[in-house]
Curated annotation (Swiss-Prot):
It comes from Streptomyces griseus. This is Purine nucleoside phosphorylase ORF3. Zn(2+) binds at H71, C110, H127. GO terms for molecular function: adenosine deaminase activity; copper ion binding; oxidoreductase activity; S-methyl-5-thioadenosine phosphorylase activity. InterPro entries: Cu_polyphenol_OxRdtase (IPR003730), Cu_polyphenol_OxRdtase_sf (IPR038371), Cytotoxic_necrot_fac-like_cat (IPR011324).
Amino acid sequence: MIVQHRTAPVTGSAHFAFTDRWGGVSAAPYGELNLGGAVGDDPAAVGANRERAARHLGLDPAHVVWMNQVHGRDVAVVDGPWGADAEIPAVDAVVTARRGLALAVLTADCTPVLLADPVAGVVGAAHAGRPGLVAGVVSAAVEAMVALGAHPSRITAHTGPAVCGRCYEVPEEMRAEVAGAVPGTWSETSWGTPAVDVTGGVHAQLAALGVTDRHASPFCTLESGDHFSYRRDRTTGRLAGYVWLD
């Protein structure tokens, strides 16, 4: 169920976790642990999956903050979960200084970005697809964390399973456009055609912002049958990344 669950062993420990597709109750083509509520799956199954994943991580499912992701750069600063009847805002990053509040990001090829400064007590989660990366969602998330007292030199960053630069085929013009905007994204597929490395671009942007403690998942969602991939399957589920502070 959980691909990665790491804890930063410092004051106010930060936790980072990424799911795979197993251990849930969703039926095909969303099987099994689909955590996305806007992909056509049974809402009851999604709710059960979200509760399973949260309990597995020792979290209260009611204290997990989800986003309405739209491939942009807007950030929400939160100090608690959304209200039961609240409209979840259209954002692609969320940050908080509230300990015990988990932030979640959904993906199925895009790069999930988890950020934490345990000293300041600030965490963030961002959804970095190609459009959001170019729009600046990574820098927007870091800037929002800094506004809450974080410092880039203290931030630990984890990127989760995503389509890799050897698989994310794009037209030559798109590769040139993205690489011109975000250094580190220029790539080539394993079969020799133009490609974009979104995760590489995320790490390049984080490095430029002064974030040196960075970690990347080894899993390519398109290649791995243990992960959901929109590019591979189209109708499919969503993985989740979670970050929180004790």
